[in-house]
Amino acid sequence: QNDDFEKCLPVTGEITALELMQNANFKLEGTNKYGNNVVCRLNNLPKPSTPIGVKGHEDYIEECKEMPAAFAYWAVLEKRWQVIPNPFDLNGKWAWAQVGVAELAMKPGDGLAFVFVTNGDVKFPD
């Protein structure tokens, strides 16, 4: 889960984060309970038959039944484009998405990031 992938896609109007990722050929897998609103796997990571290997939970295998484990999950981050940057505005900075990927509306210029979080360690993109 340490591989970085970056893609820039041209869009002309509003699109959901789920549609954006599908158009970029990323494979998203949701959970049995929450469907595609929750990202359980991204490009088959974490692997469905291999322990995640997170310290303190070395033998845990993610089954994608309900919410992913609090110690190992994909964080969905968004960054809103703005014409004139305002340092006091959260727009233009990476922030936690407030809705699931199937509902998260993205517009031209917005950014979307998925960061695999282990034991609460979130590494926000630059």
Regions found by a protein language model. Give the residues of each.
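Ubiquitin-like/PB1-type beta-grasp interaction modules and other compact soluble beta-rich domains
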Residues: Q1-D126
